[in-house]
Amino acid sequence: MRILKATLAVAISMVVLDLIFLGILAKDFFDQQLGPLRAEDTVIVAAALFYVQYVAVITAFAVLPAQTLRTAALRGLGVGWLAYATFEFTNWAVIEGWPAAMVPVDIAWGLVLTSSVAAIGWLAAGAPEPARS
């Protein structure tokens, strides 16, 4: 039951926070920076595949192994760094015209988002049971 609670909390909070950030708060910035690189319409299958795998990774590597809320949030920072820095640095390296201004903004968002949803997932799931000897 803990896995289900954590997964649902991570998934719901991630979608809500990402929609607010990408669809409202940072929409103009992303549109301006990406210009013609940005698709007119979101490819729903690709977005769904990303969210499903990312929720699973956050739950498995940040939420479930954490003994405390702080540890879940810190592990979320690590997962966020790996995911968002890999994406941004790779794009910056290989896509001609990738805007350098996107790199710190998107990485910072990935850190905030992933750490936050890991903490939310941990709170929803509750602390793990103590190990039995």
Task: Explain the meaning of each model-derived region.
Residues 1-133:
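Juxtamembrane/disordered regions of integral membrane proteins
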